[in-house]
């Protein structure tokens, strides 16, 4: 049985230059003696000295050497790296700390207490500020900072299940839930992120799967971290890669809409379901006859959810529905 405590998962791809400051902040965590914790570096097919730097940096601080573990994941991709980290975790809670996230010294202890106090929290997020190695941020950065996992994730604290998802940066979750959410039977339906590919909707997909399982998303500003953003992030090369990633982003957005629709249906009042079944089927027939602009794909999904009658829904929709039926608490 997995032990009580927190495993901090740091997924790395060529992170040698970014790791020292990140590990410094992890080594400086103020964690009470009754809370067990560890740091797991997942070297995700790096071609630099990521693993060596991690080991050497950790030795600089007054922390037991066994508190840091380095594991390798040869399959490139953030989802593979996170899965490897979760599989290796010794403790029941996970913190996904990006290689450029500098966690506040109370992050681990606060995260543990919040998760322990509410068993229905599936994922927990915090607030970040940004720093850079450039002289200053570009003029446009403040208006776009949320896309860089910077700032507040919500105008209100507490349950944000129906208002927003959570960033993967600094996200806290339960090890069991992460392993249950993504596995061989139910892998991600998204294209995913590999190496230098920038587009990724895995964080949002994970949040949707938690909601389908009956868990909640929480936001708490006692969890704070600094997000280091290199000036390379606004270089022409990086911007070009961002533009190229938009094709993947469009696909991901279409697939995530299926999760969004199913979650809405799950929380629809039972008294409205018969009405929606009839309305949806009539809308479907009208669509076939070319008499309405009713969303053809959406009508099939809604009818499938309520009646289990397949009018031609795609495989991903069926997989999402199967995941919901098997894992709903």
Briefly describe each language-model feature range.
Residues 143-163:
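Short, flexible, basic/aromatic active-site loop/helix in glycosyltransferases
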Residues 189-206:
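Acidic donor-binding loop at a coil-to-helix junction in glycosyltransferase catalytic cores
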Residues 106-140:
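Conserved donor NDP-sugar-binding/catalytic core segment of glycosyltransferases
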Residues 15-29:
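Short, well-formed alpha-helical segments that are part of the catalytic scaffolds
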């Amino acid at each position: 049985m997995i032990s009580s405590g927190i495993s901090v998962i740091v997924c790395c791809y060529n992170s040698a230059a970014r790791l020292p400051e990140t590990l410094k902040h992890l080594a400086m965590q103020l964690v009470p003696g009754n809370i067990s914790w560890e740091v797991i570096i997942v070297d995700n097919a790096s071609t630099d000295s990521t693993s060596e730097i991690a080991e050497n940096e950790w030795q600089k601080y007054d922390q037991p050497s066994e508190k840091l573990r380095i594991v390798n994941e040869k399959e490139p991709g953030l989802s593979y790296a996170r899965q490897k980290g979760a599989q290796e975790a010794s403790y029941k809670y996970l913190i996904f700390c990006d290689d450029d996230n500098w966690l506040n010294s109370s992050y681990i202890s606060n995260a543990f207490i919040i998760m322990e106090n509410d068993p229905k929290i599936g994922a927990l997020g915090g607030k970040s500020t940004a720093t850079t190695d450039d002289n200053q941020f570009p003029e446009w950065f403040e208006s776009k900072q949320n896309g860089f996992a910077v700032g507040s994730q919500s105008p209100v604290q507490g349950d944000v299940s129906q208002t927003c998802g959570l960033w993967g940066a600094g996200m806290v979750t339960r090890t069991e839930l992460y392993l249950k959410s993504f596995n061989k039977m139910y892998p991600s339906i998204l294209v995913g992120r590999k190496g230098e590919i920038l587009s990724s909707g895995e964080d949002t997909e994970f949040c949707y799967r938690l909601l389908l399982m009956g868990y909640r998303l929480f936001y708490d500003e006692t969890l704070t971290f600094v997000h280091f953003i290199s000036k390379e992030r606004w270089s022409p090369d990086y911007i070009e890669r961002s533009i190229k990633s938009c094709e993947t982003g469009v696909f991901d957005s279409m697939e995530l809409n299926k999760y969004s629709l199913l979650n809405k249906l799950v929380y629809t009042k039972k008294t409205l379901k018969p009405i929606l079944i009839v309305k949806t089927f009539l809308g479907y027939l009208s669509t076939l006859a070319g008499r309405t602009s009713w969303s053809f794909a959406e009508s099939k999904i809604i009818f499938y959810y309520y009646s289990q009658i397949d009018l031609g829904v795609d495989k991903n929709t069926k997989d999402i529905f199967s995941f919901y039926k098997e894992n709903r608490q």
